[in-house]
């Protein structure tokens, strides 16, 4: 009976494991520390130690959890880890089973950004050989950005000023927040499903790294790279950069610069047309002058080598052949006159003046037609723009405020349900003409399910 009080190693280890499993404080543990002894075998699991200056904790992260982290862990990296404490019975030790990991500190996003940039650059997503040439004269431009930001106003204003005939199709999307990257990818896909879009602008106004982060997401960068429609990326201000800038066909410093790259200025085209017209007239005038000089040379040649001079020499030589020479001279004069008339007729026939006048008339008609078409299209686009502005004003949340509704915020976040509030919470209510601040003193939820 004395032997019954002794436990096996497996039994005591199992007992300790059960203690960890039932301890509520061990089921979800948040740990901050430095990674060391990092190993990743072919299985895809991560084995490492989390340490600080006083202790260390053996840890493991299984493959499914590893696939969900957005960066590559490295030795010496400070991290924040969520997981549970358990017992590895075969080794007889407790260890940390990590379920989520993210870099710790201000530079966390920069680390993730640089690692993703290096990965995509190795895959060739930023190669110059892949970039497409922007069309010289697009007729339709798609814009993927927020419908309420300054970026869309700058793009629309610039395009309509430079080339009023170009149709601009705006694909409104959220440009920051949890689902912003997904919405941007969806809109890029919709644009590529069409066959009439010549060039696409994606972007937003300036902001912090976190606010611009959607354009650093891997799905967005790959969607820009895979787009069959040429893409101009215009994210933030001139000093801001996003990974979509590198995978796009062209990077613009600002949304306004993107619009200038997308369409030419019709005034520049008019100047180029006028310049070509001037060059055509200059070449024609030079050709006419050369023909006139050639004609003068022919006249001088005819005077110096004409039959009259030959006849005078024959008369001085002998009177005997006077009559015969007169007859011969008359025949030769008639022949030369006929030839001269033929040459003169041919010269008039091939004279370029009539062709020049015809070309000038056609050029004037085409210019007049082009001006009428541009004015007509400008008027049509202005009418469409006015209707769109009226529709946007009708859908504006400010219209709801004018009808007596209010919008409630808690700590700067929109309150969508009474479940978002607790008794004692401070709230702000935006109403027509201003806002009020209040505190929740009572709460009653709607049990009807509405």
From Swiss-Prot:
Its EC number is 3.1.11.6. GO terms for biological process: DNA catabolic process. The keyword Amino-acid biosynthesis does not apply. Pfam families: Exonuc_VII_L, tRNA_anti_2. Heterooligomer composed of large and small subunits. Belongs to the XseA family. This is Exodeoxyribonuclease 7 large subunit. It comes from Listeria welshimeri serovar 6b (strain ATCC 35897 / DSM 20650 / CCUG 15529 / CIP 8149 / NCTC 11857 / SLCC 5334 / V8). The lineage of its organism: Bacteria, Bacillati, Bacillota, Bacilli, Bacillales.
């Amino acid at each position: 009976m004395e032997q019954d009080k002794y436990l096996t190693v497996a039994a005591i280890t199992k007992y300790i494991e059960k203690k960890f499993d039932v301890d509520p404080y061990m089921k979800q543990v948040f740990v901050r520390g430095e990674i060391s002894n990092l190993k990743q075998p072919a299985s895809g699991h991560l084995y490492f130690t989390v340490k600080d200056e006083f202790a260390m904790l053996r840890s493991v992260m299984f493959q499914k959890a590893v696939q969900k982290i957005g960066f590559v862990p490295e030795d010496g990296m400070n991290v924040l880890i969520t997981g549970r404490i358990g017992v590895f019975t075969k080794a007889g030790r407790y260890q940390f089973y990590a379920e989520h990991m993210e870099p710790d500190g201000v530079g966390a996003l920069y680390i993730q950004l640089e690692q993703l940039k290096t990965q995509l650059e190795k895959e060739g997503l930023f190669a110059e050989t892949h970039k497409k040439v922007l069309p010289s004269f697009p007729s339709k431009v798609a814009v993927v950005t927020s419908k309420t930001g300054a970026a869309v106003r700058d793009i629309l204003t610039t395009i309509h000023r430079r080339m009023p005939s170009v149709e601009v199709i705006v694909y409104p999307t959220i440009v920051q927040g949890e689902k912003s990257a997904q919405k941007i990818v969806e809109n890029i896909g919709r644009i590529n499903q069409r066959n009439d879009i010549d060039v696409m602008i994606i972007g937003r106004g300036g902001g912090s790294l976190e606010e611009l982060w959607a354009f650093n997401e891997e799905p967005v960068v790959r969607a820009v790279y895979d787009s069959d429609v040429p893409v101009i990326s215009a994210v933030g201000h001139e000093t801001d950069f996003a990974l979509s800038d590198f995978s796009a066909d062209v990077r613009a410093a600002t949304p306004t610069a993107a619009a200038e790259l997308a369409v030419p200025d019709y005034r520049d085209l008019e100047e180029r047309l006028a310049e070509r017209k001037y060059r055509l007239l200059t070449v024609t005038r030079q050709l006419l002058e050369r023909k006139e000089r050639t004609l003068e040379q022919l006249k001088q040649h005819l005077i110096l080598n004409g039959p009259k001079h030959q006849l005078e020499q024959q008369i001085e030589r002998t009177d005997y052949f006077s009559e015969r020479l007169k007859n011969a001279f008359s025949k030769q004069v008639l022949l030369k006159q006929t030839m001269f008339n033929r040459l003169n007729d041919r010269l008039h026939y091939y004279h370029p003046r009539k062709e020049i006048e015809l070309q000038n008339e056609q050029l004037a008609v085409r210019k007049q037609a082009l001006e009428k078409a541009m004015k007509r299209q400008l008027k049509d686009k202005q009418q469409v723009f006015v209707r769109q502005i009226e529709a946007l004003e009708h859908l504006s949340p400010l219209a709801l405020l004018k009808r007596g509704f209010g919008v409630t915020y808690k700590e700067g976040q929109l309150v969508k349900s009474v479940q978002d509030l607790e008794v004692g919470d401070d709230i702000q209510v935006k109403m027509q003409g201003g806002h009020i601040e209040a505190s929740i003193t009572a709460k009653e939820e709607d049990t009807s399910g509405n």
